[in-house]
Amino acid sequence: MPGPSPGLRRALLGLWAALGLGILGISAVALEPFWADLQPRVALVERGGSLWLNCSTNCPRPERGGLETSLRRNGTQRGLRWLARQLVDIREPETQPVCFFRCARRTLQARGLIRTFQRPDRVELVPLPSWQPVGENFTLSCRVPGAGPRASLTLTLLRGGQELIRRSFVGEPPRARGAMLTARVLARREDHRVNFSCLAELDLRPHGLGLFANSSAPRQLRTFAMPPHSPSLIAPRVLEVDSERPVTCTLDGLFPAPEAGVYLSLGDQRLNPNVTLDGDSLVATATATASAEQEGTKQLMCVVTLGGESRETQENLTVYSFPTPLLTLSEPEAPEGKMVTISCWAGARALVTLEGIPAAVPGQPAELQLNVTKNDDKRGFFCDAALDVDGETLRKNQSSELRVLYAPRLDDLDCPRSWTWPEGPEQTLHCEARGNPEPSVHCARPEGGAVLALGLLGPVTRALAGTYRCTAVNGQGQAVKDVTLTVEYAPALDSVGCPEHITWLEGTEASLSCVAHGVPPPSVSCVRSGKEEVMEGPLRVAREHAGTYRCEAINARGSAAKNVAVTVEYGPSFEELGCPSNWTWVEGSGKLFSCEVDGKPEPRVECVGSEGASEGIVLPLVSSNSGPRNSMTPGNLSPGIYLCNATNRHGSTVKTVVVSAESPPQMDESSCPSHQTWLEGAEATALACSARGRPSPRVHCSREGAARLERLQVSREDAGTYRCVATNAHGTDSRTVTVGVEYRPVVAELAASPPSVRPGGNFTLTCRAEAWPPAQISWRAPPGALNLGLSSNNSTLSVAGAMGSHGGEYECAATNAHGRHARRITVRVAGPWLWVAVGGAAGGAALLAAGAGLAFYVQSTACKKGEYNVQEAESSGEAVCLNGAGGTPGAEGGAETPGTAESPADGEVFAIQLTSS
């Protein structure tokens, strides 16, 4: 019979579980008391916010339930044992909602607490005074209306970023809202234009909320300091009408001085001051002026204001009128003998004095009458006026000049008859005439031409010298006078009167004379350099008269000196020292023939070949004054006989010159090869080096480093680098020669490793040969030896897996162009007899088969001719002749040296040669 289905099983289990839980619930109801619960029990909500309250009970079947509160509700949700309600627009600082249920004729209650908080959205700092005196206290007051709870609120007063005072309101009632903080602060200078503010912080972090902070708008404080004393006023006591005088008002101890105001006035007239600051000091400067309507005593006032306070100073100032004296002449320009009246007046209250004579009373004019003469011309008249103002005597004066008209006069004092001036310095020519109007003076040469620039500063030149007629003219007449101008100047020696260069001809008659210009006329003398004798009169010219003469001219204005070079010319002449009769030219030196000729002017020299290979050829010369014909270059000069001809404008001369050619040593590859080879044992000879050159060079060769020992025969030690030097009278040449010594081969070493070999073992034969040029290595192995290997240069023979057939005699031969040498070595392969017998039987069969094929190949013509070379004989089946030739032992190397092993008598030795790739 099948069991119950799984679904039925689950249903039964659920039923049992429900019954069990019901029984347990009934038991719990019977055992536990009933209660009501309100969540959240305590809540903190922002003012105007909302909150959900959850009211629940453990009563299994409550009769009814609810939530009592004075707050506004927005929505309700219910269950059997719970109630949820949303409270909105919560504004009361504190309220206590009550959750209740009716259960088993009992009322279950739970009471909650809801408190509100308000952020410090409004932080107000009471306005500050517009100006606050430094050193006095002012009030800082901060209000935060509505923010709370107050117990969580903190207020801070700030000066800029500096904290002045901080206050928290811990312990205030929970329902308390809003706060205020007031402080008295001492005003300082550094507080000027500093911002003050208030910071409010509502800290609800202990209640699970954040920190809410806000600041007031900053308020700027302006502080000031005003001194107790009044400004200092500097001003004149009196001021003339239409004149300007400075007025200065100063006050110290101001702060901030740039914000102070200044008011300056004269009577009802406001002045415009220019204010300058220096720290806490203020200086106001203005210009005071007054009109005629302000004449009298006026009040000058200065007022300085700052921060609503002011300081004031007043001074009295008297405005007066005092015109400049009026000085008049009845005729400012009067002819000689005319009567002129002079008068002076200076206003109604001034007392005037004319030429020291005062007027009778103040306000009246002073007068003077004069019959003028020429002595009154340019006479000045002076009038002085005095006025008393406010106890102070003020003065003004005026002057005027009288001009008297008369005809010109030229006297010797103002226009001398004769002038003598030195040349050069600037002078002013004065020829003045007396007269009024002022005469114009004109000085010119009587015959016309040059005119003197009178009254102007200018240089004195010789062209100004001469006689001039000066005429003075004005409206009253004219005057005439002749004057003479003399210009003196130091001597001058020019090229016309005293040339710098004079040429004389040897044997003629000449004299040295120099003419100098100057005023007064100078004296001239000429002296030869280094001597004291003065040259005077004619003389017979000789070469020793050539040289430099010093000519000096002297007068009262100075002296002048000049060097005169005297050249004595003569015909050409040869001297052996300057132009040798025999000259040797060295090839390649680039040196030219020097043929110096005595003569003036310098002769032109030309040397031309007269016979042989040099006939008609021009010899190149050192002198730049050579002939015009084409000459040889220094590299192809031809020896021979040359005729040298020297010519100048005074004659010519001829000289014979014999030219010979020589050359320095020269070596090259053809005469002295740089690489030479000797054969060891040959007769020792010198290096094959020679050199070209005249005279014939001597060649000497020496070894570099260690010296070469003198031997009869060439040795290997003679190899090395040699330096060959060729020398003659004109120099040296050298070459470096490398000498190589070649020698026949010698097998210096033939060794086996290991010395004895067991069957199946490995062994190696090493062959080392000494030879130059390097030797070719070849091997001869025992017949039947297979599986042989050779190194790349055949110097090593190796066997892997040795057998009895590998035992026997091996020969190593070294061969080069100078001979052949061979050595032999015997290899033994030892082992047990049983191994030998078995191996021998097997090996014998193999050897018989291999031997037949090998014999056929070894006897072949190709092997005899040595035409094959293999890598591995055993693997490839190819074979070569190990002696490399396949002929008789002496076919390439000649007879073997004593002590070496000999080849078989029949001359046919064949073996297998193995070479590696």
UniProtKB/Swiss-Prot annotation:
Residues 1-31 form the signal peptide. Belongs to the immunoglobulin superfamily. ICAM family. It comes from Mus musculus. The keyword Phosphoprotein applies. One of its GO terms (molecular function) is integrin binding. Expressed on neurons in the most rostral segment of the mammalian brain, the telencephalon. This is Intercellular adhesion molecule 5. GO terms for cellular component: glutamatergic synapse; plasma membrane; postsynapse. Residues 884-908 are annotated as: Disordered. It is a single-pass type I membrane protein. It comes from the Eukaryota. Residues 32-833 are extracellular. The keyword Hydrolase does not apply. Residues 884-893 have a biased composition (Gly residues). ICAM proteins are ligands for the leukocyte adhesion protein LFA-1 (integrin alpha-L/beta-2). Glycosylation at Asn-54 is critical for functional folding.
